[in-house]
Amino acid sequence: IYGGAYLFDKSPDSIATQILRKDGWGYSDWFAIGLDSYYDKRTCFGFHVSPSGSMRDMLHYNDTDTDDSWDAIWESKSVINNDGWSTEIKIPLSQLRYNPSEEEQRWGLNFYRRTARYGEESFWAPIFMESKGFVSQFGILKGIILPKQNRRIEVLPYISSADKLEPGDSEDPYYSKHNIIGNMGVDFKIGLGSNFTLTGTINPDFGQVEAE
């Protein structure tokens, strides 16, 4: 799925462009696409991009709950222009969950924009705060025909090394102050039908885990 937006701004020099790590929030403008690919009006896959190229993804469930730990593999590119900023998004179908069918189907759809300096948020399909629900207020995307999905398999191997300096006797011919340690492992995801995904790690790299 390809998506894009041109977000006009009369003061492009004031666009908030804080550079953030993956899934960070911070002080930044944002554009997002929300896809209810089951069209159950309860589940949504959200993809956010900022003017600086920062990316966030999340899973909405039970209409109003959010899971920020959900991670997808997708791409985006953003550029600041003289009259605002623009962005393009590429979302592989393998990252979404949907019911394959040769017949035309409907998805829930919404677009979101955040202008940080005004604290302003806007939606293509209005989200009324006085109404209960979030995904259930999405608009409708029609005319989708999608074939059966291939088995979803994602493999992300890693290799890491560390150089540990250790004191010792410099006159010892076998002494080396460098103690190089290597490590390797792999993360994987295997799709089990359209509703389930098996996620696992072999020899996890705890050095890359953020401290809470």
Task: Pin down the residues of each PLM region.
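Structural preference for beta-rich elements and adjacent junctions enriched in aromatics
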Residues: 1-212
